[in-house]
Swiss-Prot record:
It is found in: Membrane. Glycans are attached at N32, N215. It is a multi-pass membrane protein. The lineage of its organism: Eukaryota, Metazoa, Ecdysozoa, Arthropoda, Hexapoda. This is Sodium channel protein Nach.
Amino acid sequence: AAFAYFSGFMLDDARFSPAEIELMESVLLDNNLTMVQFVDRLRWDCHELLHRCRYHGDIMDCTQLFQLSKTFFGHCCSFNLRQHGLDFTAQAAAGGLDNGLSLILRYKDENYDALQSYSHGFKLLIQETDAFPSAHADCKFLGLNTESFATLRVVETFCSEAVKSLPISQRNCVFRHEFRLRYFSDYVYPNCELNCRAKNMVKLCGCHTYFFEFNRTKDRVCTFRDIPCLVDNFPDIITRRKKTQCNCPLTCEHFDYDVQMSNFALMLNMPVVDPFYTGIERNDAIVHIFLNSQVYRRVRVDLLSNMVTLVSHLGSAFSLFVGMSMLSLVEIIYYFTVILRRNYVQECRARQKLQTLHRRPNFGWPGDKNSNQQKSVFYIRGRN
């Protein structure tokens, strides 16, 4: 039941009574445990969740590919993640299903605790290597007794040398070595947002949550007694208000991942010749993660124009006036004054003449001097 209390470190709707908080706090004191040690005692290990792994077509020991890491959602088993305290494996993958990563996930504990979802399964986060796993990642759900195929479409954004030579104020982005963070060693935009949340936690509650503990600072790690403060200040912590927001410039060079998922029910009675599927069970979750193509798109950010280019363009325009004589200047003035005015006057006279020639006939009553009564006869009078 202790897992329900950890939602107080992440959500704003997890409120507990003082008696419940003191009960959990007494567990730490009686066992002489810190919050980080307490969480480590409750978590699963990767070998308990990863039943079988295959990479580049070879079945491998999952511990060679995955390491236990900290995320915004707690502890996770991470592949190719660069994080403090982990050995970065720098695994490379080619396109196609055979060159991707295949996993058989098995949840061995049948005594499910109270969940915040009506589904049982695993959460899959796909993101940049240097980013701290959080809600900024592309999140997918892997249900039990299913086989899922996750295809990745990669887009890389990089800058030319001309852009790199510009100051930050002109390119409106930063490179990873140009912006330092207090709680993270590598700068990417998601890390900056989370760094801002951690700073707000320390400012408002005097501590930060256990998953931000990387031994980079001496700030206190929040305990169960700090949950009411975290919940009450949740809008300010997650920067919903402008006064608690931080300056987080975009990164000039980054990778973006578009993930497309396909899910199918797991058929245990289907005969297969692939040894990867040997011994699968009813509640297993199988997932295949691979690049959809051998090539990927690279977007280059380049400099369209700078001061040198602008001056050269203006110089080309000014070169039209090189060798201009006084007579040419007089001709230009004469054209824009006398010639244009004379053409305008001639156009007005021509329009008046056309209106005169096409004027409508006039209708009038004839005058009769010998009769006092007005006659009901009219005539048409025209001009030659």
